Amino acid sequence: MVRDPKTVILTGASRGIGHSTVSFFSKKNWEVITCSREKPPEECRRDPNWSHHITADLEDGKSLDNFVTEAKELLAEKPLHALDNNAGWSPKSPTQERLGCLNGDLEAWRRVFELNFFAPLKLARGFAASLRKGNGSIVNITSIAGHAIHPFAGSAYSTSKAALSSLTREMANEFADLGVRVNSVAPGEIETAMLSPDTEVLIPRIPLNRLGQPNDIASTIYFLCSEDSTYITGTEIFVTGGQHIL
C-alpha cells in the first residue's frame, strides 16, 4: 500500500536556510507548501514536490491571515505533518547599524517582533487543527543570538529570538494535548546572504573552526519532523559548531 506523501508548510522559503530546507524535504518526497515575500528561484518552482508557493508578508496581519486561508484550502481536509517557522528579519537602521537599545525607532522593533515572534505563534494557531490530524511537528528557527550577546545581530533581532525560544517551550506544553510536538533549531554562523561581511572574524570562536552550511540546518529541521524524533518536544537544538558552549 502506497502512503500519501507527508506535507510541510515552510515560511521564508525564497533563499538561504529556507531554500535549502525546501530542497531537503522535497528529496524526501514530502509535499511542500511555501511562503515568502519574494518569489522562489526558478529551479525550486520546477520541483515536482513543491506543490504551491504563496507570496505573503507575514509581518502584515491581513497578509498572514490570507496565507493561512489559502494554505488550508490547498490542504482541504488532509493532515499537515510539519510547520517550519523559518521566516525572520534582522534589519538595519538608516545608518546601516543593526537595531540596538539606543538606536532605531520602536516601530522598527515592533516590526521585527511581528515577523520573528508573533508570526510563528499566529501560524501555529492557524494550522493547529491540521497539525492535530497529522500528529504534526512545529519547528521554530531561533538563533545563537537569542542566548548570548552577538556582535552583528542587534538587540531587536536577538531579543525576538530569545522570546521565540521561550515561546517554543510554552507551545510544546500546550500543543502536547493535540499530539503536536514543538521544538526549535538555533543556528550559529551559517553561510547565507544574511551573514554580516565581518562574520569571518568569528570563526576562531567556533570550536569546529568553520562556518555552517544551510543544509546543516535543513537536516536538523527534517529530523525534528521525522519518525526518528517522536519523543522529542520542547527542545532547542544548537547547530553552531560548538560556538554556543564558549
Regions from the PLM with identified roles:
Residues S14-R15:
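Conserved glycine-rich cofactor-binding loop
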Residues P94-C101, D105-R110, L202:
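Substrate-binding pocket helix/loop in short-chain dehydrogenase/reductase
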Residues A124, S160, T168:
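Active-site helix of classical SDR
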Residues A129, N173-D177, T230:
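Alpha-helical segment proximal to the catalytic Tyr-Lys
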Residues N135, A176, R181, I232-G234, ...:
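Short, small/polar-rich loop/turn modules that mediate ligand/substrate recognition or access, typified
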Residues S143:
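Residue(s) in the substrate-gating loop at a strand-loop-helix junction
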Residues A148, V201, Y222, T233-L246:
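Short C-terminal tail/terminal secondary-structure segment
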